[in-house]
């Protein structure tokens, strides 16, 4: 079974994702698990340390005011959406 888990930012999302991955590996030892997260969150440390592959995306929130930073973040989000589709297409997950 091939599984993608998306978890980023804080341990509140990453640790449950790792727990789910561990349970899947226990039940289905031949399963392949891929994590997708950001390049600046806790996942860059926690996921590889748990023994799982991590692919990263650049995702940023938007500010309330109109700014050049918001424009750049929108472009990064569009690019990250394309990259996420690429990761999914290449990995071909069952779940």
Task: Please annotate each region the language model reported.
Residues 3-8, 30-81, 87:
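Conserved nucleotide-sugar phosphate-binding/catalytic loop shared by glycosyltransferases and other
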Residues 88, 92-95:
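Proline-aspartate-enriched helix->loop->beta-strand connector
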Residues 28-29, 91:
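Helix C-cap/helix->beta junction micro-motif
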Residues 1-2, 26:
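Short, Lys/Arg-enriched, disordered terminal segments
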Residues 13-25:
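Short amphipathic alpha-helix
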């Amino acid at each position: 079974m091939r599984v993608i888990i998306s978890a980023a930012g804080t341990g509140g999302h990453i640790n449950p994702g790792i727990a789910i991955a561990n349970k899947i590996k226990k039940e289905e030892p031949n399963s392949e698990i891929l994590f997708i997260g950001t390049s600046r969150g806790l996942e860059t440390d926690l996921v590889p340390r748990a023994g799982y592959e991590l692919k990263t995306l650049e995702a940023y929130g938007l500010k309330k005011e109109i700014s050049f930073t918001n424009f750049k973040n929108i472009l990064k989000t569009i690019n990250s959406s394309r990259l996420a589709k690429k990761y999914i297409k290449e990995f071909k997950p069952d779940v």
